[in-house]
Amino acid sequence: MNEVFESYLTYSAGVRQFTKATIDSYKNDLIIFEEWLKELDLNIFELKASDIRIFIAELADKKIAPASINRMMSTLRGFYKYALRFNLTKMNPISSVRNLKLAQKLPVFMFPKQAQEFCRLPSNAGILWETRDAALFASLYSTGCRVSELAGLDIKDLDKTLSYAIVFGKGKKERKVFFAEFAKEYLREYLKERSDLVEKFKGQVQKDGKGKIRDTLFINQKAQPLTSRGIRYIIDRYVELSPELKHLSPHAFRHSFASTLITRGADIRVVQELLGHESVSTTQRYTHITAEQLQNLYKTAHPHS
């Protein structure tokens, strides 16, 4: 890979402290961009906005999804900001290039009853680790955490009464999230079993991707940290058992958390804080969900609808 791209990735990982998943995503985007530059024999620091638009058009011709193209543009914006900051260039060809318009899709979510039924699903399914999986689902729904945030949660981040936890979101921003009573019950049961399992595998120290010792809250059956990918796999296994929720994604727990709060009258700024959104406009997507819910309820219940 181009030396300048490599230095940008090193900077993003070390100074900006972006996650490994983010760095991997940036790397993939830059590899695609570099291949395109080589094909046309172009210099990265001599490009014009028109060149970037041609690159976008070629990606679209290859049926790359608009959201993926926009993500790639975000990667390039970050790179050129870095290049400008360290005087590698005086030009930013992407500054005037707009993102592609995306079709507005409402987030997939569960109603409270569905979410609680999903949390009870492991006890009847007889697959994987029932107690852990119930605690995992209840924690996702109760806190509104991202999957990556829950995977990054250590025992030390929990309040002693299990009332709340401190999580680290995007950009390493710290926030407090809360566990509902039903989630606390699932967690207490899981923590007992977890303690027994850790004792069984005593001596096999938990380590993260960087080799640092951890005491991760959610672990696999070998007492090692459960990764974001592992959590997604677990959710997918249970979704297979629920035909009515076949389109459910791991992020749906977070969507369900937000829509439940807003439906019950929570202030949108409070919901924004609990979700860790930088902009309230991101949180406002969930007001569209509740508006649709009300409309459907009206159609079902009103005699003259």
Curated annotation (Swiss-Prot):
| CC annotations in GO | cytoplasm
Biological process terms in GO annotation: cell division; chromosome segregation; DNA transposition
Q: List residues of the Core-binding (CB) domain.
A: 1-84
Which GO molecular function, any one, fits this protein according to its record? DNA binding
Q: Tell me where in this chain the Tyr recombinase domain is found.
A: 105-299
Protein localization = Cytoplasm
Q: Does the keyword Cell division apply?
A: yes
Q: Where do the catalytic residues lie?
A: 146, 170, 251, 254, 277, 286 (o-(3'-phospho-dna)-tyrosine intermediate)
Similarity annotation: Belongs to the 'phage' integrase family. XerC subfamily.
Question: What task does this protein carry out?
Answer: Site-specific tyrosine recombinase, which acts by catalyzing the cutting and rejoining of the recombining DNA molecules. The XerC-XerD complex is essential to convert dimers of the bacterial chromosome into monomers to permit their segregation at cell division. It also contributes to the segregational stability of plasmids.
Q: What is this protein called?
A: Tyrosine recombinase XerC
